[in-house]
């Protein structure tokens, strides 16, 4: 209501609801709101849209990692007897290769990703009980093959201090009178610092918010509504000469 905003709201199922609320407030107050800006949702969303538009007959796949899942790490930390933890989401390489082959496999959650947990337990804690709570936790670990390692606090700080992440968005499709030609569109990210990369995306979209507001636009927008030129620091002439 008071400012132009750019956010990284990332609960996919609630984005339509969030959009409606921000759109109403922004239009009533004469501001711009750019929501769900980051890499997923965000950069991955854009690549899904482009790939679906180009290959309407096809199949989408998203793989996350290898990287630290902050939400899953927090879920482990809430278990009694856990002092600290890091959880890595890891794509299953054989699943990735099957998708890249263009065979359009049907993959379950368990077949696409594994989860690896590094846990620092409180002194005297029941390690078996902690491990059982982790691997059976609904919505987080129960649907995955999950490995739990108990390590020292020193090892955690030495080997798992960063917040890397990344992933792959892949669409496979066919063209031709008899669907005889297969195509694979793949976009990938490998990030040493998830927060730093996400903030870089937010900064680019802040430029767009500024430009849109200068044009007199109001209301809520997503990455789907923003032309690429609005993100760049350079003007259109530079982009056409050097990047087109």
Where are the regions a protein language model picked out?
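Gly/Ser/Thr-rich loops at beta-strand to alpha-helix junctions
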Residues: 11-16, 36-45, 66-70, 123, ...
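Rossmann-fold NAD(P) dinucleotide-binding segment
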Residues: 1-8
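Oxidoreductase and adenylate-handling cofactor-binding alpha/beta cores
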Residues: 20, 43-59, 74-84, 208
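Short alpha-helices
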Residues: 27-52, 202
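Rossmann-fold NAD(P)-binding glycine/threonine-rich loop
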Residues: 9-33
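Short beta-strand and adjoining strand-loop segment in the mid-core
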Residues: 52-54, 59-63, 116-121
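NAD(P)-dependent Rossmann-like dehydrogenase/reductase catalytic/cofactor-binding core
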Residues: 183-244
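C-terminal substrate-binding/catalytic lobe of Rossmann-fold NAD(P)-dependent oxidoreductases
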Residues: 69-206
